[in-house]
Amino acid sequence: MISDVHHVGIAVSDMAAALRFYSEALGLPVVKEGDAPARGARVALIAVGGSYLELIQPVMDGSPFARHIEGQGEGLHHVALRTDDVEALVASLREWDVPLADKRPREGFSGRLSFLAPEAMDGVLLEVVQPTPELSGGNAPTGAVTRIDHVVLRLPDVEEACRRMLYYFGVETKRTFERGETRFSFLRPGDVVLELIGPSTPADAGLRTGPEARDEPLARPSDTGEAGPRTGFIAGLAFECVGIDVLAAELAAKGYPIGEPHPALQGGRIVSVHADGPGVAGVPVAFIDFTDSPR
């Protein structure tokens, strides 16, 4: 049903500044750029290994992306999941009464797509897309940044979100653990990992990850009496890289506020760029180098 994360959408107010960071500074190619009149936006698609970043600048007041920036500021907007048959997938989602913003797939910037409604994943906006052939494979990395390693989703109920990912898309949870009052679950629909973070649930809750879990009823928004999405949001974006010390030094020399590389919990070394940096567009960005600690 779902084969990978196709792209991560970022709402930006200054496309030129965002391209200077995400394309020029990171050495990543822009593979498509143009207008999306129906959405009131200017869009640039940047290849990152086998996936993409989609930079979206609103050019029309009242567009979904203008409203996003007005209400929440620049930043991570949506995660697009790749499918080889968007018509069949959306038909299944309709049959299962999954809340949809696009009840029928439509032509979009990267292919034929449909957005789920925010309440389908407690406020995290998901898209399903069947990309055009030329936007199906990304680009082989040529610089320090090689791929999107993971996307962080912060959710009010991680266990329920994992069950929805299985129910909606057939994506199983690979690993779950708790640290203090926080629960972490990891899903890998393809090359890119989805890291779900939220409050801990009781230790005996028993997350079921096999196919049989799809037979259990979901706690839908209507069941809770809530009219709209809850508190979920896309909380961070991490790239895998090689030569992390050189990359950090180069970004610092170009004026981007970046920390010092240090050991990462998942192995390797990690460094972060401040979300308020020029062109970073409010995104918590991290770079991870697994060279000395391959996964």
At which residue positions do the language-model features occur?
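N-terminal beta-strand motif that seeds the catalytic metal site of vicinal oxygen chelate
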Residues: 1-16, 76-83, 131-160, 234-237, ...
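Core segments of cupin and vicinal oxygen chelate
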Residues: 2, 10-52, 88-111, 153-193, ...
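Extracellular/lumenal glycan-associated surfaces
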Residues: 51-54, 85, 236-239, 243
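DNA polymerase sliding clamps and clamp-related checkpoint/processivity subunits
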Residues: 54-75, 79, 83, 102, ...
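A low-complexity, Ser/Thr/Gly/Pro-enriched, surface-exposed linker/loop concept
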Residues: 60-63, 241-245
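Conserved secondary-structure micro-motifs at functional edges
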Residues: 62-63, 187, 196, 231-232
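Vicinal oxygen chelate
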Residues: 87-144, 181, 185-190, 195, ...
